[in-house]
C-alpha cells in the first residue's frame, strides 16, 4: 500500500468515508434477513427478495450520480446526499416491526440505504481515482476497496456482538439457527417474549447505526472538490 497516497487530501477523506459507510452497509444491513425471517416469519427466499429495494436504490443512485457528474463536472455533492440518505434509512429501519406500518418503514428505509450506497461508494472511487496520477490508479482503487471491506468486517463484528449482548440469556440459541420457526412456537407467551427480545435487539442495531451515519455525513462534507480529469489512460510517449 503506497503510503504517499495518504498525502493527498481527497484520499484522506474518502478512506474514512468508505470505511465508516462500510461499517453501516455491511454491518447493520446483514441482519435485515434475520429480522424478516424471525420476526415477520417470511421464508429465506422471500427475505432475500425483500432486499430488492436496496439494490433498486443502489442502481438508481449509481446511474443517476454518474450521469449528473458527467453533465456537471462535479462530484462533491453526491457523497453528502448519499450519507444523508443512509442516515434516513437507518432511522426508518430502526422503526421496523411486523406491523404493516413497520414493514412499510423498513422497505422505504431499504430504498434510502440503497440510494446512500449508490451515492457514496462509486463517487468516492471516482474522486479518489481522479486525484492521483494514472500510474497509481490500481493501487488507489485497491486502497478504497480494502478500507470499505475493512469497515464492513468491523461493522459486522461490532453489530453482531451488540446483538448477542442484547439477546444472550433471553433467547435459546437453537432458535436462531431456524429463525422462521420462531413463529411456530406453540407456547404463545414464550413466542411473544422471544419475538420481542429479537425485535428490540435488532432495531437497537439501527439506532446505534444512526450516529455512525451522522459521522459519515460530517466526513462527506470535508471532501475537496477537484475538476474532473478530461483525458483517460496514460500519456503517450513520443518514440521518434
What are these regions (language model features)?
Residues 1-169, 205-216:
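12-transmembrane solute porter fold
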Residues 78-80, 85, 171-172, 186-187, ...:
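Short, surface-exposed, charge-dense and proline/glycine-enriched linear segments
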Amino acid at each position: 500500500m503506497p503510503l504517499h497516497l495518504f498525502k493527498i487530501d481527497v484520499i484522506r477523506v474518502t478512506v474514512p468515508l468508505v470505511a465508516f459507510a462500510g461499517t453501516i452497509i455491511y454491518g447493520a444491513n446483514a441482519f435485515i434477513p434475520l429480522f424478516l425471517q424471525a420476526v415477520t416469519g417470511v421464508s429465506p427466499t422471500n427475505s432475500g427478495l425483500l432486499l430488492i429495494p436496496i439494490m433498486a436504490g443502489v442502481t438508481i443512485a449509481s446511474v443517476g450520480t454518474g450521469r449528473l457528474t458527467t453533465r456537471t463536472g462535479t462530484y462533491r455533492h453526491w457523497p453528502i446526499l448519499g450519507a444523508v440518505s443512509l442516515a434516513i434509512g437507518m432511522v426508518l429501519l430502526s422503526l421496523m416491526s411486523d406491523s404493516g406500518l413497520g414493514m412499510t418503514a423498513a422497505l422505504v428505509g431499504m430504498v434510502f440505504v440503497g440510494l446512500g450506497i449508490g451515492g457514496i461508494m462509486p463517487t468516492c472511487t471516482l474522486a479518489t481515482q481522479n486525484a492521483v496520477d494514472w500510474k497509481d490508479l490500481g493501487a488507489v482503487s485497491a486502497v478504497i476497496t480494502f478500507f470499505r471491506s475493512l469497515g464492513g468486517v468491523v461493522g459486522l463484528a461490532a453489530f453482531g456482538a451488540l446483538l448477542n449482548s442484547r439477546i444472550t440469556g433471553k433467547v435459546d440459541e437453537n432458535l436462531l439457527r431456524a429463525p422462521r420457526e420462531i413463529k411456530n412456537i406453540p407456547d404463545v407467551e414464550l413466542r411473544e417474549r422471544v419475538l420481542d427480545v429479537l425485535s428490540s435487539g435488532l432495531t437497537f442495531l439501527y439506532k446505534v447505526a444512526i450516529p455512525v451515519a451522522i459521522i459519515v455525513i460530517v466526513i462527506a462534507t470535508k471532501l475537496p472538490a477537484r475538476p474532473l480529469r478530461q483525458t483517460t489512460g496514460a500519456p503517450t510517449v513520443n518514440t521518434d
